[in-house]
Regions:
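Residues within the helices of the helix-turn-helix
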Residues: 8, 19, 33, 47, ...
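Short alpha-helical DNA-recognition segment
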Residues: 15-33
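The alpha-helix within a helix-turn-helix
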Residues: 11, 22, 50
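Short, charged recognition helix plus adjacent turn
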Residues: 9-10, 34, 61-69
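Short amphipathic helical patch at the helix-1/turn junction of helix-turn-helix
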Residues: 12, 37-40
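Short, basic-rich loop-to-helix N-cap that marks the start of a DNA-contacting helix
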Residues: 39-51
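A short, Lys/Arg-rich alpha-helix, primarily the initiator
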Residues: 1-19
Length: 69
């Protein structure tokens, strides 16, 4: 399962808000909504976020194993 938890940690560490992503950097509010709900994003979006946040992919997402219930 993909988690965007590192993305929110990176935002906090870089002192960047979602508002700034949208209005200062022109990032899509729809993509932020998708990420909040654990939906897929494109590699192009990952590349854009890495550029804005000056981080690697592991600063945006992480993979965790799903537990069988």
């Amino acid at each position: 399962m993909i988690s965007y938890r590192p993305f929110y940690n990176t935002l906090y560490e870089k002192n960047i808000t979602e508002y700034q992503l949208i209005f200062k950097f022109g990032f899509s509010a729809n993509i932020l909504h998708r990420m909040k709900h654990g939906k897929a994003i494109t590699t192009s979006t990952l590349d854009t976020l890495c550029g804005i946040l000056d981080c690697n992919v592991d600063g945006i997402l992480e993979h965790t194993k799903e537990e069988n219930v």
